[in-house]
Design a protein with these regions (language model features):
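Active-site cores of enzymes that catalyze phosphoryl transfer or operate on phosphate-rich substrates
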Residues: 194-216, 283-345, 644, 771-837
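Thiamine diphosphate
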Residues: 2-7, 16, 46, 119, ...
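Subset of Sec-pathway N-terminal targeting signals
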Residues: 2, 7-48
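Conserved phosphate/anionic-ligand binding catalytic regions in large, soluble enzymes, centered on
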Residues: 95-112, 244-273, 358-377, 448, ...
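Glycine/aspartate-rich loop-and-adjacent alpha/beta segment that forms the canonical ThDP
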Residues: 100-103, 107-160, 168, 277, ...
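Cofactor-binding active-site loop characterized by glycine-rich and histidine/acidic residues
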Residues: 255-419, 423, 626-678
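Hard-cation-handling environments
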Residues: 486-487, 497, 501-614
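Extended, charge-enriched "interface" segments that sit outside catalytic cores
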Residues: 48-238, 254
Length: 936
């Protein structure tokens, strides 16, 4: 109860962070004359800690202004305080200024169609603050109002506030608790007074870019009527906005820009921003495509790369490939950017800029958006802020009523969870759009935080060009039909100002249409790529059978083992962790056999020794969910951390392990993006339990399993999914192996179930050393991490290799074997122990360690000597409708002799992955083991 009262008090208190600016202005009045503030505020300020009598408190704004003037001019100014005779209404003036900062956006002219019916905001009226018409001619101190003056008449203050906060830009930033950030925005927003200044050349550029945006859509509509293109029309300003963002980024020193967006306006961006040849796009509309391999994807999912000339040099652009699943590309872009920043050593995030482009319904509706915002400042996922642009066309397919699409005032309110400033802007005002674009990027670069631009526009056609929007939005589309295009409106504005003429505007239209007819690049800033940002050439054209060197010199391996077991003497470990590290030293010396954790650590150490980068993330990945990894050592005295794998030697590759935010979808998407931009190293995502990975099913289905076939995108991401039936119930038993196997085709990925420490060692090394990059899905163990039989020798690591299938290990007489049991994973040890207990000699057990691509030759070799076999059995712990049985039995049948019988031993089909009662689990487990080992 106490916590609830305290929370309520803080939220309503004047000490709440959102009121900081207002309180500071009141305090400055109090310093000039305590009687100018109310008795309540006077008591608050009187109660502040007193300064020594020889110290005089000065208003903060005066001090800031003083030093600002010193920096700009040679002569000095004395600090002066306000006139003590200022009228008490001064407080009301400051309240009015604050009201506009907080709520002016609610009265801004944001909707190009003028259809928004928003209630009046009483606080924006001077009369609400008891300011009369007579007061309008009075002069008041403006406080922190960054208008360039200390005092102004109230009428001038009021008019300025209207222009700044209620024009084409609606600024939301007072929810930010950091006063420095709010002051920074005010000092750049308020002096402009709603009228940004641009040169004649810049204005012509904006008109040219609006002409291009409109011209392409009209050209496509005429040339390919009825074809889906998800037109940008109505949101044309996105093209000049994005190009201005890139130009400003280049001038700021950026070297790369990575863009993620959905289908709306994508074709326009490809042609008019990234420089895709119009003829190539026309060929796609006509059904032509290259003779490459792969199934391909629709044109509005395609990515693209190019270089773009800016005042600061060429900037490399990359538009990410993406599916129609809205918003999922955003964490992919962040992962790609993080990889590029790591590769460039861009520690201050000043060289690579992420831009994500959203829809208004999607940013409010898709849960991955909140996950992505939550990652934005987390250590393992921060990219120094993302510029997030919302193409707010006020309708999602057929739904336009905000009460149906969200529960908030704006679609962008979700961004307030990370205190991102939000700039709403009317897309029919391209100069306001350009101003907000620069302001947003400058904020991102200054504070390295996310910033949102809400580009309020409309959709001239239906969801696609074959759709009829009047059926569901009749009033909106009656208005749109009569509404001039953004190009026409801006051309008229420039003509009225005398900065352009009708002939010039028409000439731009004709020149752009002629350029489209020629089919060549229409972006004047386009440059051929000097070099690929990410070099994939070493990994192209290789199949699964390319040889790789699994050997590692024993002496070097032992040396690495000793190094990764060292930590400073002053670093006090938990007793259990200390025992694990002592045991690992014994494993290196040969006194003990290697367990899973040590073999895994040695695999990482060898890759780091070769200069490869390793990145591991997941919930609890530093320690490991099951207390086996301990890559991060925590000092029990001061909570400091030490990572032995980062301290092997000076020339090693970088090693990073992050305990991720508690998200599967956004984090896995981030790691996919990272792996697609960092092919040379190891990128590994680990689920806390494999059961929870289906929270990221969109990433698995749309990117990991199919990205190569759809888009030709290689990816070497590794997924560790703890899997195994140990009586822990339906939520902690199954990584849903069957779903990954169902997705396997066309050699698209690997599904592996390693059963020994040596296997996991070679599996990890193979993923990096072998010059082929495809996803690796691993059913990793839980109880096997400490199983007494699940051990390997140093010899197995140094001179062994990964075995896709492992034959019988006991000395059985092949002629006596009547049954061969195939299996994968933990169940092997249950079968082995029970067979030994039974002293059976007639059943051989073969482990299939790699279920896809299926190792047909290796399995056939493992059973070749068993010529008297009566039947073959596939044994699994999972229910019959799950696991590998349904998805892989055709492979098992192909491996055994023609006409041989293949039986199933496992749990019966079940709607749930596992039972919830330990007693039932044990009964089922015993039955399936007996079934597998008992001959008919």
């Amino acid at each position: 109860m106490h916590n609830g009262v305290m929370k309520a008090w803080l939220e309503s208190s004047h000490l709440a962070g959102a009121n900081a600016t207002y309180v500071e202005d009141l305090y400055e009045l109090y310093l000039s004359d305590p009687d100018l503030v109310s008795e309540e505020w006077k008591r608050v300020f009187d109660g502040l800690p007193a300064h020594p009598t020889n110290v005089v408190e000065q208003p903060h704004s005066r001090v800031r202004d003083y030093f600002r003037r010193l920096a700009q001019e040679t002569k000095h100014y004395n600090v002066q305080v306000s006139d003590p005779e200022v009228d008490a209404k001064q407080v009301k003036v400051l309240q009015l200024i604050n009201a506009y900062r907080f709520r002016g956006h609610e009265a801004a002219k944001l909707d190009p169609l003028g259809l928004w019916n928003r209630p009046e905001v009483a606080e924006l009226n001077p009369s609400f603050h008891n300011l009369t018409q007579e007061d309008m001619e009075e002069t008041f101190n403006v406080g922190s109002f960054a208008i360039g003056k200390d005092t102004m008449k109230l009428k001038d203050i009021y008019q300025s506030l209207q222009k700044i906060y209620c024009g084409s830009v609606g600024a939301e930033y007072m929810h930010i608790t950091d006063t420095e950030q709010k002051r920074w925005i005010q000092q750049r927003l308020e002096p402009v007074v709603g009228t940004p200044v641009f040169s004649k050349e810049e204005k012509r550029t904006f008109l040219e870019e609006l002409t291009a945006a409109e011209g392409l859509e009209r050209y496509l509509g005429a040339k390919f009527p009825g074809a889906k293109r998800f037109s940008l029309e109505g949101g044309d300003a996105l093209v000049p906005m994005t190009k201005e963002m890139i130009r400003h980024a280049g001038a700021s020193g950026m070297r790369e820009v990575v863009i993620g967006m959905a289908h709306r306006g994508r074709l326009n961006m490809l042609v008019n921003v990234l420089g895709k040849k119009p003829q190539d796009l026309f060929d796609e509309f006509a059904g032509k495509h290259g003779e490459g391999w792969g199934t391909g994807d629709v044109k509005y999912h395609q990515g693209f790369s190019a270089d773009f000339a800016t005042p600061g040099g060429d900037v490399h652009l990359a538009l990410a490939f993406n599916p129609s699943h809205l918003e999922i590309v955003n964490p992919v872009v962040m992962g790609s950017v993080r990889a590029r920043q790591d590769r460039l050593g861009d520690e201050d995030c000043s060289k690579v800029l992420p831009i994500t482009i959203h829809g208004d319904s999607a940013i409010a509706g898709q849960g991955v958006v909140a996950e992505t915002f939550n990652m934005s400042q987390a250590r393992g996922f921060c990219v120094g802020g993302t510029v997030r642009i919302v193409v707010n066309n006020q309708v999602g397919f057929t739904t336009s009523n905000p009460r149906d699409t969200r529960s908030t005032m704006y679609c962008t309110d979700i961004a307030k969870m990370v205190q991102a400033p939000i700039f709403h802007v009317n897309s029919d005002d391209p100069e306001a759009v350009a101003f907000v674009t620069r302001l947003a990027l400058d904020y991102r670069n200054e504070f390295k935080r996310d910033v949102v631009i809400d580009l309020v526009c409309y959709r001239r056609h239906g969801h696609n060009e074959a759709d009829e929007p009047n059926a569901t939005q009749p009033l909106m589309y009656q208005k749109i039909k009569k509404h001039p295009t953004p190009r026409k409106l801006y051309a008229d504005v420039l003509t009225e100002r005398g900065e352009c003429d009708l002939e010039t505007a028409t000439q731009l239209v004709n020149e752009y249409r002629d350029a489209l007819d020629h089919g060549e690049v229409v972006v004047k800033e386009w440059r051929p790529m000097a070099m690929h940002s990410v070099d994939w050439s070493p990994y192209l054209g290789h199949d699964w059978h390319i040889p790789w060197n699994s050997e590692y010199a024993m002496e070097r391996l032992q040396d690495l083992g000793r190094r990764v077991c060292q930590y400073p003497e002053s670093h006090v470990l938990h007793s259990r962790v200390e025992k694990i590290y002592q045991d690992r030293l014994s494993m290196i010396s040969g006194e003990k056999m290697l367990d899973w954790g040590m073999a895994e650590t040695l695999a990482y150490a060898t890759l780091l020794d070769d200069g490869k980068r390793i990145r591991i993330s997941g919930q609890d990945s530093g320690r490991g969910t099951f207390f086996h990894r301990h890559a991060v050592l925590h000092n029990q005295n001061d909570a400091s951390t030490y990572i032995p794998l980062s301290q092997i030697h000076a020339g090693q590759g970088p090693f990073e392990v992050f305990d991720s935010v508690l998200s599967e979808e956004a984090v896995l998407a981030f790691e996919y993006g990272y792996a697609t931009a960092e092919p040379s190293g190891l990128t590994l995502w680990e689920a806390q339990f494999g059961d929870f990975a289906n929270g990221a099913q969109v990433v698995i289905d749309q990117f990991i399993s199919s990205g190569e076939q759809k888009w030709g995108r290689l990816c070497g991401l590794t997924m560790l999914l703890p899997h195994g039936y140990e009586g822990q119930g339906p939520e902690h038993s199954s990584a849903r192996l069957e779903r990954y196997l169902q997705l396997c085709a066309e050699q698209n990925m690997q599904v592996v179930v390693p059963s020994t420490p040596a296997q996991v060692y070679h599996m990890i090394r193979r993923q990096v050393v072998r010059p082929m990059r495809r996803p690796l899905v691993v059913m990793s163990p839980k109880s096997l991490l400490r199983h007494p039989l699940c051990v390997s020798s140093m010899e197995d690591l140094a001179h062994g290799t990964f075995q896709p299938a492992i034959g019988e290990i006991d000395a059985l007489n092949p002629s006596q074997v009547k049954r061969v049991v195939f299996c994968s994973g933990k169940v092997y040890y249950d079968l082995l122990e029970q067979r030994r207990a039974n002293e059976q000699q007639d059943v051989a057990i073969v482990r299939i360690e790699q279920l896809y691509p299926f190792p047909l030759e290796e399995v056939q070799a493992a059973i070749a000597n068993y010529t008297n076999v009566v039947d073959y059995v596939w044994c699994q712990e999972e229910p019959q409708n799950q696991g590998a049985w349904y998805s892989s039995q055709h492979n098992f049948r192909a491996a055994i002799p023609a006409g041989a019988d293949l039986k199933y031993a496992g749990r019966p089909a079940s709607a749930s992955p596992a039972v919830g009662y330990m007693s039932v689990h044990m009964k089922q487990q015993k039955a399936l083991i007996e079934d597998a080992l008992t001959l008919a």
